[in-house]
Amino acid sequence: MFSLQKKALQHIYMTPENASELTKDLLQHLGLYWNGPIIKMDTVVYLHNKIFSNRSVLKYALAKQANITIIKTLVLWVEPEYALAQALKHNRKDVLECIFSYHLTTPKYHHIMHLTSSQELFEFFHLFICKSKNYNARMECLLYAATLYNFPNILEKNREYIIRHSIGNSLFAIACKERHIHLIAWFVTAGVLDTYDDSTLFNTAFKLGDYSLLEVACDLPIIYPDYLIISMMQTAIQKNYFRFFKKLLTHFNIYRQIIITDAAYYNRRKILLLLLNQNIFNNFAILCALSAAIKGHASKKTLNLLISQLDSQMTVVDSVYYSIIKYNNIDCIPLLMQIKTFKIETLISIAVHGNNINIIAACKAFLPKDTLYHLVLKMAIVSRNYKLFKLYTEKENPMYIFTTIKAIISNLVNYTVVQAVAIEYLRKFHQERQLPIVPLLMVLAEHNYITKFKKTCYAANMSDQNVKRALIKCLFIASQKNYCQIFKYCFGSLLKVLSKHERVKFFNSVVFAKKLASYYDHQNMIHLIDSLIERFRYLIKD
């Protein structure tokens, strides 16, 4: 095999018009090695046992800058689109002219325009393929294509046309979509946009997840309003784009409470760590973020991160408690117990008001039983939540509950309205469980509920020795606390049921009651006892 390439390229070979046979001279012009005859058959060129497709031959010819006459023949052997594409790739305007001369009516080939790197060739190619006869339509088509395929020189050349016909914004949208960074910067700085929306570039960057677009938006000579940057930071938090958030934070240096709150809510621990390391946010802001983290059911690591940043003496804000209740976040309670000022009693109080049984049940692990029941029943009474009251009393020991409510009633001395509710709940509970009457009588006498006391006595078995003893005790309570009506009612009730033998002891009890009244200087009670003794002395003596 030997090469005839150099010698062959020195001669111009005219291909026969029918182009039915590819001779050795043509092969030499193409820059190939010749070692035998070659024949064109349909779309394949045969060289003995070697096969070259027409496309390969054309591509090779263009690469070796073969004679135009040869190339003109080859472009007839391939599809027009392929021929155009290869001509664009090799920046051959002469080949394009040849193809267009063969194909006077060509379909739209906009999709291959980008194959050329030459601005001149791009415009020339567009001139042939654009079908519109209207100048403005052709120009707009060219500019859209130039934007689509990143030809800034064409846009700069036609800058005045873009401004005059107000097509800058639509072209800018294409540049953003295609991520042409230099074009985007040109649109913003060239003054071709009618109304530039500051958020457009940011929104596109987030939509496409393109960090380079965000960098362009940040580096443009534009003063963005704070609300826009905050909004973009929130978007970065929601999408968990850490790089985007860090770029916005470091570039614009904007810190707001809503940012750390959102980061906590969406459980973005890396972003939270970045924010907290700046030492910008105070305890209140961190507490608000903690509340948001509870609301969003953030991970334990996120909660611990926020808790570790708090001052141990910082008072826990109500929003933290309300978030636990409202969003039923039980898992965070053990973690919050690390904060010295976190009060489980406050949490239970709010849970009772919110009727959140799950939270109340979860608090059992952190309080003694007596404290828990006292607190829950008290709050149920205060909030008039009889359903909760019944839930926590129906399965417990009745006397334990009775004793607990009795203690609650004693604590509500200064709250007469609430105390009255507690007494009513106690009476209902006493009636439902059919407890002994004596403890209830003592409680009613202790707190001077005369009407309920009378009703209870009326329902009691007055001949029962326990009831009699209870009424005598009630005499002492009444004299000690100056409850004249209670004393008078107990006195009259006992006279009716006591035997003659018992009346002597009763008289001694009345005398002792008078001494108690004297000790506490209850003059009204003393006068009452004296009058009762005088009035009923004959009964007592009998």
Curated annotation (Swiss-Prot):
The lineage of its organism: Viruses, Varidnaviria, Bamfordvirae, Nucleocytoviricota, Pokkesviricetes. Transmembrane segments: none annotated. Keywords: Early protein. This is Protein MGF 505-11L. Induction: Expressed in the early phase of the viral replicative cycle. Belongs to the asfivirus MGF 505 family. It comes from African swine fever virus (isolate Tick/South Africa/Pretoriuskop Pr4/1996) (ASFV). Plays a role in virus cell tropism, and may be required for efficient virus replication in macrophages.
